[in-house]
């Protein structure tokens, strides 16, 4: 369940609430729990939002568990907006999530692998960069990675 935790060898893993739903077959809608994840060890915290629509759950996570150093925030699979809004964050909402979490860094996820919705495959990172600029945020602290790319600077700071 949300907020339960498992601790092993100095690592704490905790599921957190997010706005979404679950379904694996035609007969099991919302029979299992969906979640984000906070993973904490020594002096570093990583938050994985997973599949999520924008909600106050992100602020609630910070209130309970503190700000993550690094967050993986979805930026894709958002069009048509009227249908996808409750379950998938768009790039502009991803910037709001980043601010809600108070993360030091973020990586945009949930885009560019499969054509899931109507927006062009390469649109989410372009819109993210624009949204960051509008918000006055440096695109070097919230970025997208190419498949296989690493970002070692996050762990070095």
What are these regions (language model features)?
Residues 45, 52-146:
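Cap/insert and terminal regions of metallo-dependent hydrolase folds
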Residues 1-66, 130, 147-157:
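Core dinuclear metal-dependent hydrolase active-site scaffold
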